[in-house]
UniProtKB/Swiss-Prot annotation:
CDD domains: CUE_DEF1_like. GO terms for molecular function: DNA binding. This is RNA polymerase II degradation factor 1. Transmembrane segments: none annotated. Residues 1-20, 62-264, 277-438, 491-512, 614-656 are annotated as: Disordered. Keywords: Chromosome, Cytoplasm, DNA damage, DNA repair, DNA-binding, Nucleus, Telomere, Ubl conjugation, Ubl conjugation pathway. The gene is DEF1. Residues 65-90, 206-217, 248-258, 299-310 have a biased composition (Basic and acidic residues). It is found in: Cytoplasm; Nucleus; Chromosome, Telomere.
Length: 705
């Protein structure tokens, strides 16, 4: 006593701790095996301390749940009483055997202790509910079940469950039947409705046989209500039940492939006959509704999925080829001739016989599809007098449905075709003006682009020699060339600066020549400005036609979207380094391998629109110079003697022009050198490692050097 009291008093803290642990284990187990109840799991948790072993045993099937705790009906109880007596005797006398087997199993001490002290009431909570010898049905069952578990693991005659004694007492026989019983146990659950009707079921053997016969009889009209029940209320099935299904069917199905094929061929002939007879009737009777079809589907489980495009609906062939689906096999095994199985080629027949080998049970989920996608032809014998050949009725239903469905299918396909034609005719009309414009501009740009692409190729040539190396734009373009022919950076047109500088050198000639030259210069400056603007616009994606639009849009990169052919500027990465982090080895600015431009990116306040602002300043300067030139030229034509003044004006004007030129040249260079780097910085704004290029002072990139 003293020991017990001390255990009850001092062990309280420990016990709560243990309970918490067990609760945690229970939670995880219920998550993993949602179809196991707590009552099932509690005993496992007590029996094995390690969570992994429990999971292992459950998944391997070394441990099973209690049978369903459903209250048996009176008939069942009366049938099972003889067996039940044996069970209770067994459970009562089993204490010694159970203890021994538990030790042999190496079960933890807690289990043996619980068995030892089961009579006392001070045991841990779960055991207060189940004192060892209580006779209430559930606990008796549990007791018996626990023993059966042990028996399955170490097959000792002592721990044998009473079930086996009913059929054969030798444990060798039991061993050979172990697998059978594993397969049959889950099937018992599924077969419960049929079992309730059949009368002789004390032991498991009859159940197994009966389940086989049930399977064979299944699809015939007698068993129709059963199937309806199974479909209408989805049954909760254990994974074991699902997994162990196919073998039974495979047996049945392999017995009967020849019969099936004969049935199908007979059906074909009769279908041909009736199809010719009934074409007239058919059109008047296309009103069968889908709901009726659905009812037939459930009443008689023989469902044939429709293939819409298989045939056009003609006078004779209102039927069309159907693949015998996995779900059909039950039905096909016992086709009565009321269902038109429809014409199948020889290949389809072979398929059917092959498919018979592995037939899954059609689960309740499929019942939902039946109404919509599977037309099924039920047994129509209820509606007809038995003398009338059942063929006819089935055929009628079949034909209404068949004629109905393809017609609707045809309508929808026609409608779809019309709409697609309309869309197709509209689309080119919408696109043509834009396309024409862009094609024109691009054909104008082509020679220019090719020249630039060649230049860029040459410039980057050394980089193709290093096999593993890829420079930033390499995969951005869809053409073979890298991005440059899309004008993402503009190579300055050569030849303009040189021409103008030569003209500058000639400006010491007579004033009449000077005036002509000045006019030429004006034109050239205007051209140059336009070209620069075009370059910038192309570089930012504005088509070169919009000159003023450029200033309105402030040349922002967002206007890339006005030119569909251009690559998007920010998402520009090609696949190959989509996944690299955008840091030193793979990131942007390695343009010159040997470091031809030792530049650094300015810090965060960098202005991406600098070039545009410079060009605007240039515009203002040239406008001023133009206006002054106009005044000068008019005054010069009026009076020659004022040439001195005019010369002064000219010199001023020349200096202005020279400044504008210098600015333009500088700007072109700026574009060439810094455009890429600018783009790189912009590209990296969206990237995960936002290094702004090589800034050796910045905190972010310091680690890489």
């Amino acid at each position: 006593m003293s020991q017990q009291y001390s255990r009850r008093g001092g062990g309280k803290a420990k016990r709560t701790q243990v309970d918490a642990e067990k609760k945690f284990k229970l939670d995880t187990l219920t998550e993993l095996f949602p179809d196991w109840t707590n009552e099932d799991l509690i005993d496992l948790v007590h029996e094995f301390e390690d969570l992994e072993t429990i999971i292992d045993k459950i998944t391997t099937g070394a441990v099973t749940k209690w049978d369903e705790v459903k209250k048996p009906s009176k008939k069942d109880r009366q049938q099972k009483e003889p067996a039940g007596d044996v069970e209770h005797i067994h459970a009562g006398s089993a204490a010694a055997a159970f203890g021994a087997s538990a030790q042999a199993q190496g079960a933890p001490a807690s289990l043996q202790r619980s068995h030892h002290s089961a009579g006392h009431q001070n045991n841990a909570k779960p055991y207060q509910r189940q004192s060892k010898y209580s006779n209430s049905p559930r606990q008796g069952k549990q007791q018996h079940q626990r023993k059966e578990k042990v028996a399955k693991e170490n097959l000792k005659p002592a721990g044998q469950p009473a079930k086996s004694t009913a059929s054969s007492t030798s444990w060798a026989a039991m061993l050979s039947k172990k697998e059978d019983s594993k397969l049959q146990a889950p099937e018992q659950q599924l077969e419960e409705q049929p079992q309730a009707q059949s009368q002789a079921q004390q032991t498991e053997e009859p159940v197994a046989k009966e389940s086989q016969t049930e399977k064979k009889v299944g699809p015939q009209p007698v068993a129709a209500p059963l199937h309806e029940e199974q479909d209408s209320k989805p049954k909760k099935m254990t994974w074991a039940a699902i997994a162990s299904k196919p073998p039974k069917h495979a047996e049945n199905a392999s017995k009967k492939p020849q019969e099936i094929l004969q049935n199908v061929q007979d059906l074909k002939k009769e279908i041909n006959k009736i199809a010719t007879e009934d074409t007239a009737v058919e059109h008047s009777e296309t009103t069968v509704t889908h709901s009726e079809v659905g009812v037939n589907a459930q009443a008689e489980h023989e469902s044939f999925p429709i293939e819409d495009g298989a045939r056009s609906v003609g006078a004779d062939d209102t039927y069309y080829a159907e693949n015998v689906d996995a779900t059909n096999e039950d039905a096909a095994a016992t086709v009565n001739g009321n269902a038109p199985a429809a014409s199948e080629e020889a290949a389809a027949q072979e398929d059917a016989s092959n498919a018979n080998a592995n037939v899954p049970v059609s689960l309740p989920a499929e019942a939902n599809h039946q109404a919509s996608q599977q037309v099924s032809f039920g047994s129509e014998e209820k509606q007809q007098t038995p003398q009338q050949p059942s063929q006819q009725g089935g055929m009628h239903a079949g034909q209404h449905v068949v004629s109905q469905v393809p017609q609707s299918a045809q309508h929808s396909s026609q409608a779809a075709a019309q709409t697609s034609q309309q869309v197709a005719s509209q689309a080119p009309q919408q696109q043509t003006p834009q396309q024409a414009y862009y094609q024109d501009t691009y054909t104008q740009q082509l020679p220019q682009q090719q020249a630039q692409a060649a230049q860029a190729q040459q410039y980057y040539m050394n980089q193709y020699q290093f096999p593993g190396y890829s420079y930033p734009g390499m995969f951005d373009s869809q053409s073979a060339y890298p991005v440059y022919n899309h004008q993402q950076f503009a190579v300055p047109q050569q030849g303009q600066p040189t021409a103008q500088s030569s003209q500058n050198s000639q400006q010491a000639q007579s004033q009449s020549q000077q005036q002509q030259q000045q006019q030429q210069q004006q034109q050239q400056q205007q051209q140059q400005q336009q070209q620069q603007q075009q370059q910038q616009q192309q570089q930012y994606g504005i088509p070169p036609g919009y000159v003023q639009a450029g200033e309105l849009a402030a040349q922002s990169p967002a206007s890339t979207h006005t030119q569909p052919q251009q690559q998007p500027q920010y998402g520009g990465y090609g696949m190959p380094y989509y996944f690299y982090q955008q840091s030193f080895p793979y990131a942007q600015p390695q343009y010159g391998m040997a470091g031809q431009y030792p530049y650094q990116v300015p810090k965060a306040a960098y202005n991406y629109y600098q070039p545009q602002q410079m060009s605007q300043a240039g515009n203002q300067a040239t406008h001023q110079s133009q206006s002054s030139q106009n005044d000068d030229s008019s005054s010069a034509s009026a009076a020659n003697p004022q040439q001195g003044q005019q010369g002064g004006a000219n010199s001023q004007q020349q200096s202005q022009a020279a400044a504008a030129q210098a600015q333009a040249a500088a700007q072109a260079q700026f574009q060439q050198y810094y455009q890429f780097q600018q783009q790189a910085a912009a590209n990296q704004q969206g990237m995960p490692y936002g290094y702004s290029g090589y800034d050796y002072t910045s905190q972010t990139s310091r680690g890489f050097y």
